[in-house]
From Swiss-Prot:
It is an enzyme of class 2 (transferase). It catalyses: L-seryl-[protein] + ATP = O-phospho-L-seryl-[protein] + ADP + H(+); L-threonyl-[protein] + ATP = O-phospho-L-threonyl-[protein] + ADP + H(+). CDD domains: STKc_IRAK. The modification Phosphothreonine is found at residues 573, 742, 747. It comes from Arabidopsis thaliana (Mouse-ear cress). This is Putative leucine-rich repeat receptor-like serine/threonine-protein kinase At2g04300. The active site is at residue 707. Residues 545-892 are cytoplasmic.
């Protein structure tokens, strides 16, 4: 049998509860949603006699479907919530919409009983979605007539609205009998990523009872299991304290199973489907025997032959829960947990209960919530009753709402609505004010309806809007001048006979701020100007071609920037640069490029002016690269270029001013370190990651930054992060193209060792550098420190983790004010980013998703007192009956 006591990192987490952390009285159903699907809306809420749970009709939570009842001969088999059902003969996707608390773990359970409601005696198969992602395939074949098919999942909400959708996949008509949501404590059932799909939940007893609410305050269902050939049962009538956050029912913890043979192991096996699935397990222990002075119960825990936890001693009459902090896999999908008595133990191991969940990753992000709220308001305003207008508006793409187009190009950014077409939809009333909240809208078509009132001025404020078609309505009044004068907008107001349209402005506008006929004049003028410019350029070319350029001098011709520069951004003269900086009065900083000065443009806009020093390690090539990159990329997390100066030997870049300096200054304490708590640091790196992900996936061609570090992450007055310093940036090849062989460039410590060794550049080089940044914000340690046993930060953190010393790497300035799970996830993410092999590193898209989940976890953290010790890949929670004391394991 293999033993690897240091193969997996251990973390031991203790909850001091004083019996008060999770007080939920029987009968308290706060936050519960219990829907009897198909119950008549005329029936009031009722209390189910079997469970004391209050159920209501689902009528207010779903906009489609018909109701039915199971065969009367089967009614005696089921509780009342199962007797009715809702079925969906129309449409492909039909959804329930439920209001939830953002960032909260919910146990979500859907139950299905066909019950021959239609008299056809057939099996059903359809898909169940949670938001835009597949949750489960529902097949009633096994339980065709008299069984309940149940799907359960524990899911952390990413918005204030949760949608559960039934998807028709073939000839079967989807059905549902009940839908239940139960909020859980946020510090329980956490995952690194994804959600937990229920596999089984057993308590080890000879009892036949299924335990649920009110015995379980969270309404989990516990099923008995007992191996008669290998186990014997222990029971107690004494009180067992089960309040450890997971709070298994007292009835469950009042019994336990132990091997019949005193020296035999306690074994439990199960299978995973598919065999490659990852899982989390939660084992609940309590020693329910009063031990004598000469008695000891101590055991090791093995998973698939590997040592996971040593010398565990269950507390007497108090509950401990052991679980993995990282998802596990089993070879061939066959899993076995063994509890082995140690040499010190006089008693065999025992266990009360085990829960196992498989991990489901949900890759699709929900549509931007502002857009969702806006389109729902528009739907309600006009009473749009399209069958497809259910669930997420944009994703999955095959279920996108009719009349919408969305931008879902970036997997790390929520999709946004860019096109709304409600033409010929029998709309009445005024133009809905909610349209102004679709801030990414590019095309709006409300033509051929019966809209009245005026053309609202807010349409001119939609910056992305390129096309508005309001033709064929009954609009009246004057057209706002701001709308008529908006450049780049194509406006069609034809057919509105009551509309006051000066100068024929109701005719389709050309998109350049004037009518189509004006375009002819513009084209003529532009054509003449183009001929003059081309002629002049040809003459200059013939003159300069005759001149020779000395080898040791860069000519002004060869130094010319891309011609697009002068048309896209302002080019400043050197005298203007001197004026804006007040003769270079205020220095903001110094870098490899040169000095950076404070300045103002037009006596209003603050800017940062970076001057190229003649002795700079960077030169005109880097200057040109940075200007040309910043002129073609625009992202909220990339520093914006206001302009540049290229006059003789005077080269400068004029950026937007970042009032809070760079991240490194704050990490060193130069700018007031009290602001940089864990949440703020997470927010900064999450935003920086979004900027870097845009360079990799949003640019054409995609770009590698090549110099990601804390000094190149700048912060504005609101501590919004923006990536800066693009002088070393290079494009990189797409998959299938030839790799780029470059001269190695970057900053020591942050430089990808694989890139340094091979000279082959790809986007994973940035991922490595970003991993170093992550380690900096977690540890607040220098990247290179020769006084450490391992000078480089990645090697040092790796050694500390191998020793199980997590506390030594976390910045003590946090003072324990952080979500332990989010810190662990960030550490593991950082270590995956600095994998020596680029193929083992995540993409920046994956990094963004992981950091956003860490941030969501930190944001949803509640005030629970807890201490953290490093012990490995297992966490466990203990409750002592002597309130105010902690259980501490032996040192390894």
């Amino acid at each position: 049998m293999k033993t690897h006591p240091q193969a997996i990192l251990l973390c031991v987490l203790f909850f001091i509860t004083f019996g008060l952390l999770h007080v939920v009285e029987a009968g308290n159903q706060e936050g519960f949603i219990s829907l009897d699907c198909g119950l008549s809306p005329n029936e009031p809420p009722y209390v189910d006699a079997a469970t004391d749970l209050t159920y209501t009709t689902d009528n207010d939570f779903v906009q489609s479907g018909k109701t039915g009842t199971i065969d009367k001969e089967l009614e005696s088999t089921y509780n009342k919530p199962i007797l009715q059902l809702r079925y969906f003969p129309e449409g492909v996707r039909n959804c329930y919409t439920l209001n939830v608390t953002l960032g909260t773990n919910y146990l979500i359970r859907a139950s299905f009983v066909y019950g021959n409601y239609d008299g056809l005696n057939k099996e059903l198969e359809f898909d169940l979605y949670l938001g835009p992602n597949l949750w489960a395939n529902v097949n009633t074949a096994v339980y065709l007539m008299n069984g309940v098919t149940t799907e359960e999942i524990i899911h952390s909400t990413k918005s204030k609205v949760l949608q559960v959708c039934l998807i028709k996949t073939g000839e079967s008509i989807p059905i549902i009998n009940s839908l239940e949501l139960r909020p859980l404590i946020n510090d329980t059932y956490n995952t690194q990523s994804g959600s937990l799909k229920y596999l089984f939940r057993n308590y080890f007893s000879t009892s036949r009872r299924i335990i649920r609410y009110p015995n379980d305050v969270n309404d989990r269902h516990w099923y008995p299991f007992f191996d008669e050939d290998a186990w014997t049962e222990l029971t107690t009538n004494l009180n067992v304290n089960s309040s450890n956050g997971y709070d298994p029912p007292k009835f469950v913890m009042a019994s336990a199973s132990t091997p019949i043979s005193k020296n035999a192991p306690f074994n439990f096996t199960w299978s995973l489907i598919p065999s490659t699935a990852k899982f989390y397990s939660y084992m609940h222990f309590a020693d329910i025997q009063t031990l004598q002075a000469n008695e000891t119960r101590e055991f090791d825990m093995m998973l698939n032959g590997n040592l996971a936890l040593e010398r565990y001693r269950p507390k007497t009459f108090a509950t401990g829960t052991i679980y993995f902090i990282k998802p596990q896999i089993c070879e061939g999908g066959q899993c076995i947990i063994e509890l082995l008595k140690t040499s010190k133990s006089t008693l065999p191991p025992l266990c009360s209960a085990l829960e196992v969940f498989t991990v489901i990753d949900f890759p699709e992000l929900e549509t931007n919530q502002d857009d969702v709220i806006a389109i729902k308001n528009i739907q309600n305003t006009y009473g749009v009753s399209k069958t497809s207008w259910q669930g997420d508006p944009c994703v999955p793409k095959r279920f996108m709402w009719d009349g919408l187009n969305c931008n879902n190009s970036y997997i790390s950014t929520p999709p946004t609505i860019t096109f709304l077409n409600l033409s010929s939809s029998h709309l009445t009333g005024i133009i809905a004010s909610a349209i102004q909240n679709l801030t990414h809208l590019q095309n709006l078509d409300l033509s051929n309806n019966n809209l009245t009132g005026g053309v609202p001025e807010f349409l001119a404020g939609l910056k992305s809007l390129l096309v508005i078609n309001l033709s064929g309505n009954n609009l009246s009044g004057s057209v706002p001048q701001t709308l008529l004068q908006k450049k780049g907008l194509k406006l069609n107001l034809e057919g509105n006979i009551y509309l006051n349209c000066p100068d024929g402005s109701c005719v389709s506008k050309d998109g350049n701020g004037g009518a189509k006929k004006k375009n002819v004049v513009v084209l003529v003028v532009v054509s003449i100007a183009l001929v003059v410019v081309l002629g002049s350029a040809l003459a200059l070319f013939l003159v300069f071609r005759k001149r020779k350029t000395p080898r040791n001098e860069v000519s002004r011709t060869s130094r010319s920037l891309d011609p697009t520069i002068t048309t896209k951004n302002r080019r400043f003269t050197y005298s203007e640069v001197v004026k804006m900086t007040n003769n270079f009065e205020k220095i903001l900083g110094k870098g490899g490029f040169g000095m950076v000065y404070h300045g103002t443009v037009n006596d209003a806009e603050q800017v940062a002016v970076k001057m190229l020093s003649p002795s700079s390690s960077q030169g005109y090539k880097e200057f040109k690269a940075e200007v040309e990159l910043l002129l073609r990329v625009h992202h909220k997390n990339l520093v914006g270029l206001v302009g540049y100066c290229d006059e003789g030997e005077n080269l400068s870049l004029i950026y937007e001013y970042m009032a809070k300096g760079d991240l490194k200054e704050h990490m060193l304490g130069n700018q007031g370190v009290s602001i940089l708590d864990w949440k703020t640091r997470l927010k900064i790196v999450a935003e920086s990651a979004q900027g870097l992900e845009y360079l990799h996936n949003g640019c054409k061609p995609p770009m590698v930054h090549r110099d990601v570090k804390t000094t190149n992450i700048l912060l504005d007055e609101h501590f919004q992060a923006k990536l800066a310093d693009f002088g070393l940036s290079r494009s990189f090849p797409l998959e299938g193209e030839t790799r780029v062989d470059t001269v190695v460039a970057g900053t020591p410590g942050y430089l990808d060792p694989e890139y340094y060794r091979t000279n082959w550049l790809n986007e994973k080089s940035d991922v490595y550098s970003f991993g170093i940044v992550l380690l900096e914000i977690i540890t607040n340690q220098h990247v290179i420190n020769q006084s450490r046993e391992k000078p480089h930060i990645a090697e040092w953190v790796g050694v500390m983790l191998t020793k199980g010393d997590i506390k030594s790497i976390i910045d003590p300035k946090f003072s324990g004010d952080y979500d332990a799970g989010s810190v662990w996830r960030a550490v593991e993410l950082a270590m995956s980013c600095v994998n020596p092999s680029s193929t083992g590193r995540p993409t920046m898209s994956q990094v963004v998703i992981e950091l956003n989940e860490c941030l969501a976890s930190e944001n949803s953290r509640r005030g629970m007192s807890q201490n953290m010790e490093s012990k490995g890949s297992i966490q466990y929670t203990e409750v002592s009956t002597n309130f105010g004391t902690e259980y501490t394991p032996e040192a390894r």
